[in-house]
């Protein structure tokens, strides 16, 4: 865990940035989720200083599996890691760049490229984010990115990650019928694009 008040402050700043980027976290997990995000951030900050990248990568793979299976897609973890690195770089600009997360982050990019292609995946996310914004009723920012990430998690062997997210996004008590239809259409499109990239 962080050892000084400054390190704790940096970890909490990174947690705040990750939390605020994805309103989904607050909508779904509330204050309890914020506390978990803060504690995860302190642990991630500690990993950023770990001496061996291979150990860090294994720890991040474990955390990814835990989070994705609970409805928190890997893209949120990636964003959190980036926020940790940014907080460290801003506070200590003269220190060498931290590389402990590089292998894990590079693997995630390669995974997305392999499963849906870089351009196809980005295009689908853009199109469906516009469609989600146009839906009536309750709306969650960046939903298409989250759904696409959960789809990648599921197709990368994290069983149950897609329903852990999409069951919440298709709850008729929470979301409109047009929103729910778009969730299902995005999943169909991801399957279609995946079939073309094989």
Task: Name these PLM-found stretches.
Residues 1-198:
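Core of compact, soluble alpha-helical bundle domains
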